[in-house]
A protein has these predicted regions:
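Acidic, surface-exposed loops and disordered segments
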Residues: 1-218
Length: 218
């Protein structure tokens, strides 16, 4: 499907059909989309915690704001997106090893340059105290890929930002794994009585958001 058309048609599901489940083949495609998401300096700071069962939904529900409970309760699948609490040298070497394995790096000299270059950018964030902020931005990139990837497969989704991150971390014992939850996405097929399905999409006109820099006042 043309991406503009996909962007026009995609909407946020407000209610899912609890009886419709995402085929496992499509779940694997969604996981691949997340795996392939772009990130600054290929940092890949994320961890994706995938839930499908009623038990997994009950486990995260206490951290979700009550007005979003319905989206957790009725969805087919959901993903808690977490980011690492810092990207230490060990993890950076894990990234480098994978890049070598995948054929992105031809020799040791290039490998050294790649490691030092990425470490430079990561250390910049560390020194400024912006690591979590920066990693969260990467998580949003992955989430966006998931939302549109799901839409391309005919799967509806709801991004959830309003939840108690610290409570979610405790519920899932994320501190033990050195990661912090930042986003939740619910996935499934919208219910027939989902009012958002038929509402017209509303966005500001392009004239209000795009400006020609050659004519933009300095």
């Amino acid at each position: 499907m043309d991406f503009v058309k996909l962007s026009e048609q995609r909407f946020t599901a407000k209610k899912f059909d609890v009886n419709k489940k995402i085929p496992r083949d499509d779940v694997e495609k969604l996981k691949t989309i997340l795996q392939l998401s772009p990130s600054s300096v290929n940092s890949q700071p994320w961890v994706f915690l995938w839930g499908t069962s009623d038990n997994s939904k009950k486990r995260v529900r206490p951290a979700i704001a009550d007005f979003n409970w319905n989206r957790i309760d009725t969805c087919s699948d959901f993903v808690v997106i977490a980011v690492r609490k810092g990207l230490d040298d060990k993890f950076q070497h894990t990234l480098l090893d994978q890049e070598i394995k995948d054929g992105r790096i031809a020799n040791e000299e290039i490998a050294k340059e790649c490691f030092e270059s990425r470490k430079f950018f990561i250390d910049l964030r560390e020194r400024s105290g912006q690591t979590l902020n920066w990693e969260t931005k990467q998580a949003y990139i992955a989430m966006t890929a998931l939302l549109y990837g799901a839409a391309s497969l005919g799967i509806d989704s709801t991004p959830i930002e309003v939840f108690d991150e610290n409570k979610m971390d405790k519920l899932l014992n994320l501190d033990n794994y050195g990661v912090h939850s930042v986003l939740v996405v619910t996935l499934g097929y919208d219910a027939e009585d989902d009012h958002n399905r038929t509402r017209p999409k509303s966005r500001l006109e392009q004239s209000k958001i795009f400006f020609d820099l050659d004519k933009f006042p300095g």
